[in-house]
Amino acid sequence: MLLEIITAYKIGTILFLIGILGFIINRQNILLLIISIEMTLLAISFIIICSALFLDDSAAACFSLYILALAGSEAAIGLSLLVLFHRFRGSVLISASRQ
């Protein structure tokens, strides 16, 4: 059981680092920034769920669902703003906002 939780933590950490790295590398494309933020939130939620299963804690699992609900609403608002930005500027690049 301990080996499985360590493997799950490693997977969650790798996903988190991929999300942070994507956020650092893709600073020009707004859509890729939103995807990177979502990946980091999903990685954090994955780690919390694995901890909740290991510790048999239902409150942590509920907290993880709360994080996922907030991430979904954040993505919906971000994508709607991205659609408006694309309509007005014709591009989803951050450099287009400086015109």
Swiss-Prot record:
Keywords: Electron transport, Membrane, Mitochondrion, NAD, Respiratory chain, Translocase, Transmembrane, Transmembrane helix, Transport, Ubiquinone. Its main location: mitochondrion. Its EC number is 7.1.1.2. It is a multi-pass membrane protein. It catalyses: a ubiquinone + NADH + 5 H(+)(in) = a ubiquinol + NAD(+) + 4 H(+)(out). It is an enzyme of class 7 (translocase). The keyword ATP-binding does not apply. It is found in: Mitochondrion membrane. InterPro entries: NADH_UbQ_OxRdtase_chain4L/K, NUOK/Mnh_C1-like. GO terms for biological process: ATP synthesis coupled electron transport. The keyword NAD applies. One of its GO terms (cellular component) is mitochondrial membrane. The chain crosses the membrane at residues 5-25, 30-50, 65-85. GO terms for molecular function: NADH dehydrogenase (ubiquinone) activity. Belongs to the complex I subunit 4L family. Core subunit of the mitochondrial membrane respiratory chain NADH dehydrogenase (Complex I) that is believed to belong to the minimal assembly required for catalysis. Complex I functions in the transfer of electrons from NADH to the respiratory chain. The immediate electron acceptor for the enzyme is believed to be ubiquinone. This is NADH-ubiquinone oxidoreductase chain 4L.
